[in-house]
Amino acid sequence: MGLRDWLRTVCCCCGCECLEERALPEKEPLVSDNNPYSSFGATLVRDDEKNLWSMPHDVSHTEADDDRTLYNLIVIRNQQAKDSEEWQKLNYDIHTLRQVRREVRNRWKCILEDLGFQKEADSLLSVTKLSTISDSKNTRKAREMLLKLAEETNIFPTSWELSERYLFVVDRLIALDAAEEFFKLARRTYPKKPGVPCLADGQKELHYLPFPSP
């Protein structure tokens, strides 16, 4: 189950008890200490090949689902003979995924700056393994807002699974009472194109990651 499906399941829950259970403990790290991917975390900032965010020595990434997807592609590619057909195909997928991730971040940063967060944009977008939800009471609202952004705007590309890191960004916007304004500006700046379906299956097609200009 991808993040999108998980968000749908929780947001459609009719009771409150399950939400409270999910919110405990109040401050829970995005990736727990027993995460099977944590073994390579210490080297991420030292090696661009394993830097799964956007640029060398960037420590703002975290080992979320999309990070693991990229990491697995890198591992598989490095097992191939360099410059072979399979190596080139995987290398293209890696480059494409990185480009899309950079573009998504740039779109979020652009809207944040337009809202007046010129100095705070980078820190608002910075998500690490130590990041926590500011208030567990905002968790459901953050999930719903992230789904609205994905389904009613073009801020995320089609056929791209939602990233966990943006749940933290939305939570910060809620704490700043800026989430609704962010959504309104995102809908105006990156309107959903007519005929573009909402992401429901969580499938990725790395060779075909359309990211139309606004």
UniProtKB/Swiss-Prot annotation:
It is found in: Apical cell membrane; Melanosome membrane; Lysosome membrane; Cytoplasmic vesicle membrane. Identified in a complex with RILP and DCTN1; interacts directly with RILP, but does not interact directly with DCTN1. Interacts with PRPH2. It comes from the Eukaryota. This is Melanoregulin. Palmitoylated. Palmitoylation is required to maintain the protein at the melanosome membrane. It is a peripheral membrane protein; Lipid-anchor. Belongs to the melanoregulin family. One of its GO terms (molecular function) is phosphatidylinositol binding. It comes from Homo sapiens. GO terms for biological process: melanocyte differentiation; melanosome localization; melanosome transport; minus-end-directed organelle transport along microtubule; phagosome maturation. Expressed in photoreceptor cells (at protein level). Probably functions as a cargo-recognition protein that couples cytoplasmic vesicles to the transport machinery. Plays a role in hair pigmentation, a process that involves shedding of melanosome-containing vesicles from melanocytes, followed by phagocytosis of the melanosome-containing vesicles by keratinocytes. Functions on melanosomes as receptor for RILP and the complex formed by RILP and DCTN1, and thereby contributes to retrograde melanosome transport from the cell periphery to the center. Its main location: membrane. The keyword tRNA-binding does not apply. The modification Phosphoserine is found at residue 213. The lineage of its organism: Eukaryota, Metazoa, Chordata, Craniata, Vertebrata. GO terms for cellular component: apical plasma membrane; cytoplasmic vesicle membrane; late endosome membrane; lysosomal membrane; melanosome; melanosome membrane; organelle membrane; protein-containing complex. Keywords: Cell membrane, Cytoplasmic vesicle, Lipid-binding, Lipoprotein, Lysosome, Membrane, Palmitate, Phosphoprotein, Transport. InterPro entries: Melanoregulin. A motif (Cholesterol-binding sequence motif) lies at residues 162-172.
